[in-house]
Curated annotation (Swiss-Prot):
Its EC number is 7.1.1.-. PROSITE patterns: COMPLEX1_ND1_2. InterPro entries: NADH_UbQ_OxRdtase_su1/FPO, NADH_UbQ_OxRdtase_su1_CS. Pfam families: NADHdh. The chain crosses the membrane at residues 15-35, 88-108, 117-137, 159-179, 191-211, 239-259, 272-294, 313-333. It is a multi-pass membrane protein. It comes from Bacillus mycoides (strain KBAB4) (Bacillus weihenstephanensis). It is found in: Cell membrane. HAMAP family: NDH1_NuoH (MF_01350). This is NADH-quinone oxidoreductase subunit H. NDH-1 is composed of 14 different subunits. Subunits NuoA, H, J, K, L, M, N constitute the membrane sector of the complex. GO terms for biological process: aerobic respiration. It catalyses: a quinone + NADH + 5 H(+)(in) = a quinol + NAD(+) + 4 H(+)(out).
C-alpha cells in the first residue's frame, strides 16, 4: 500500500493518508514503549528479588507507566532563567524525532514495513546520529555544569562507538551484497549472520549498548556523578521526550539486531508453519531481554575505560573482521 502511495502523484488525499499513517505509527510505538518500559521494570524487579510495579492497574501494575506519563504531562513546564531558551526547547525535539524516523525502514515482516528503501541500513545509521545533536544541545542550553558534562560525555561516547558500530555491519553488507534490510533478511534464509558473523555480532551488540547510553555505558546520565546528566534541568513533558527517545531507540536497535544477525522473520529449521511476525517477535524479545540483563548485571565503567575499550579494542577487531570477511568471501564464495 505504502509503495503504491509513494509512486502515485501528489495530492491532498495522499497527504492525509500519509499523515494518518504517521499518527497511527506514533500511537502504536508510544503504546508499545509504554508497556515495554513496564516489562523492563518487572523483569528488573524479578532479577533483583523485588515485585516491581503492582499498585496501579491491578496486581500486575498494568497502568503504572500510563500513570507515570500522565504525571509527567501534568507537571509544570519550568525553564531555568539562565538557560538558552530557544535551544532548551528545541533540544528534546531534536533528540526525539530521529527515534521515530528510523523505525520507518525496519522490516518487521516481509509484508509489514513503512518504507522499503534501497539503502535502509545507511539511512538508519545516518538518522540515528542526529540524536547526538539534541543531547549536546540540551546539555549546553541548560547552562548547568552537570548537564554540560553529561552532554560532552554523550558526544564523545556516541562518536567513539559509532565507528565500530558501522564497521561491524560492513561484514553483513559484504555477505548480503546489499544495504537493503529486506534483502539482508532474505540472504539469511539458510544461515543467520550471528553464525556467519559472530565477531561482528558481538561488536555490534557492545557498540549498540554504548550508543543507547545504557548500563554499563550510561556515563552521560550517571545519577551518582552528574545528578541526571544532560537532562538534569528538564522536567515534565520535555524530560519525557528524552526518555521516550531513549526507549524508542532501545526497541529500534533491538529490531535492527534482529534483522541484521537473527534472520528477521525467517523461521528456525522445520518450523516454517509459524508466522514470520511471531518469529520476529520472539527474536526481538530475546534481544530486549539480553539488554535488560546487561543493565541489571553490570556496573558502570569509568570514562577512560570506555574510551580505551572503544578505540583500542573494538575498532581494531572490527577492522580485522572486515578484512577476514572480505578474504573469506573472495576465496570461498
Amino acid at each position: 500500500m505504502i509503495e503504491t502511495l509513494l509512486q502515485s502523484p501528489s495530492s491532498w488525499t495522499n497527504f492525509f493518508i500519509f499523515f494518518g499513517l504517521a499518527v497511527l505509527l506514533l500511537f502504536a510505538v508510544l503504546g508499545f514503549v509504554t508497556y515495554g518500559i513496564l516489562a523492563e521494570r518487572k523483569v528488573m524487579g524479578f532479577m533483583q528479588g523485588r515485585i516491581g510495579p503492582n499498585q496501579v492497574g491491578g496486581r500486575f501494575g498494568l497502568l503504572q507507566t500510563v500513570a507515570d506519563v500522565l504525571k509527567l504531562l501534568l507537571k509544570e513546564d519550568s525553564i531555568p532563567k539562565a538557560a538558552d531558551k530557544p535551544l532548551f526547547i528545541l533540544a528534546p525535539v531534536i533528540a526525539f524525532a530521529p527515534a521515530f524516523m528510523v523505525l520507518a525502514v525496519i522490516p518487521f515482516t516481509d509484508k509489514f514495513q513503512f518504507a522499503d528503501i534501497g539503502v535502509g541500513l545507511l539511512y538508519y545509521i545516518a538518522v540515528s546520529g542526529i540524536t547526538t545533536i539534541g543531547v549536546v544541545t540540551g546539555g549546553w542550553a541548560s547552562n548547568n555544569k552537570y548537564s554540560l558534562l553529561g552532554g560532552m560525555r554523550a558526544a564523545a561516547q556516541m562518536i567513539s562507538y559509532e565507528i565500530p558500530l558501522v564497521m561491524s555491519v560492513i561484514g553483513v553488507v559484504l555477505l548480503a551484497g546489499s544495504l537493503n534490510l529486506n534483502e539482508i533478511v532474505a540472504a539469511q534464509e539458510k544461515v543467520w549472520y550471528i553464525f556467519a558473523q559472530p565477531i561482528g555480532f558481538v561488536i555490534f551488540l557492545i557498540a549498540a549498548v554504548a550508543e543507547l547510553n545504557r548500563t554499563p555505558f550510561d556515563l552521560p546520565e550517571a545519577e551518582s556523578e552528574l545528578v541526571s546528566g544532560y537532562h538534569t534541568e528538564y522536567s515534565g513533558f520535555r524530560w519525557a521526550f528524552f526518555m521516550l527517545s531513549e526507549y524508542v531507540y532501545f526497541f529500534g536497535m533491538s529490531s535492527l539486531i534482529t534483522v541484521l544477525f537473527l534472520g528477521g522473520w525467517n523461521p528456525v529449521m522445520f518450523l516454517g508453519f509459524i508466522p514470520g511476525a511471531v518469529w520476529f517477535a520472539l527474536k526481538f524479545s530475546s534481544v530486549v531481554f539480553l539488554l535488560i540483563w546487561f543493565r541489571v548485571t553490570f556496573p558502570r565503567i569509568r570514562g577512560d575505560q570506555l574510551m580505551e575499550f572503544g578505540w583500542k579494542i573494538l575498532l581494531p577487531i572490527a577492522l580485522a573482521n572486515i578484512f577476514l570477511t572480505a578474504l573469506i568471501k573472495e576465496l570461498f564464495f
